[in-house]
């Protein structure tokens, strides 16, 4: 997914890694706590919690942090989080889906709306953008975990629908990306984990059906909007159907 991979590469280039890792652990902890509160602290009996813990392990989150997030949910914490999906249009008319988990939906809505409005975008109604995407499972493994043919064979055997490889660079190793039907995600994760251990990431995503190329001045504007959304504590995931040429990416350095 170009929107995802290009954005990840840009974040690496801009030296945001320490901040991003701290934000990643915060998001993972929040998802673990929410999952445990909604479905109970038993990982084996709670599919959402099992997936959240698997993701945390895949990102090398310390076991103590994982357990603390589970304990927070079962320790009488009165915080109540609501999952909300926002849809809108960004620079060059790209479609954007923003998933938040928040204890204050007015604050979350204001932050998301501001990120769009300040960067030439606008929020739309529910469904105004989602039809441009497919809601599917996505599983990621480092390229070093297996060669392309081995990963492809194992993924298809486990029930996956599609497999792609995202090349790395001097900062990123690159990843195998496995796509599944929404309802098959946990089954495929289980099959692959038996062979390759826990993936670095496994979740439901919004995969764009087609990409819109963003060029010129709109590239910097789009990146600013993406940064504002990602920096919000309430935002869990951002998906967009953009592509950017290597030449335009180089102008951001």
From Swiss-Prot:
It comes from the Bacteria. GO terms for molecular function: DNA binding. It is found in: Cytoplasm. GO terms for cellular component: cytosol. Pfam families: TACO1_YebC_N, Transcrip_reg. InterPro entries: Integrase-like_N, TACO1_YebC-like_2nd/3rd_dom, TACO1_YebC_N, Transcrip_reg_TACO1-like, Transcrip_reg_TACO1-like_dom3, YebC-like. Keywords: Cytoplasm, DNA-binding, Transcription, Transcription regulation. GO terms for biological process: regulation of DNA-templated transcription. Belongs to the TACO1 family. This is Probable transcriptional regulatory protein Mmar10_2433.
